[in-house]
Amino acid sequence: VAILGAAGGIGQPLSLLMKDDLFNINAGIVK
């Protein structure tokens, strides 16, 4: 999860394109 969160923080545009809620949540945790 931590790795996915780090990836989410770096690749927010990618997460938006994927529209993956879990990915977005992980990105939010990192920020």
From Swiss-Prot:
Protein name, per record: Malate dehydrogenase, mitochondrial
Lineage start: Eukaryota, Viridiplantae, Streptophyta, Embryophyta, Tracheophyta
Location (main, coarse): mitochondrion
S-S bonds: none
EC number: 1.1.1.37
Family membership noted in the UniProt record: Belongs to the LDH/MDH superfamily. MDH type 1 family.
Keywords recorded for this protein, A-Z: Mitochondrion, NAD, Oxidoreductase, Tricarboxylic acid cycle
Enzymatic reactions: (S)-malate + NAD(+) = oxaloacetate + NADH + H(+)
EC primary class: oxidoreductase
Chain residues that bind NAD(+): 9-31
Highest taxon listed in the record's lineage: Eukaryota
Statement: the UniProt record of this protein carries the keyword Magnesium: no
GO biological process: tricarboxylic acid cycle
GO molecular function, one term: L-malate dehydrogenase (NAD+) activity
Cellular component GO terms held in the UniProt record: mitochondrial matrix
Subcellular location: Mitochondrion matrix
Subunit structure, as described in the record: Homodimer.
UniProt keyword Oxidoreductase, yes or no: yes
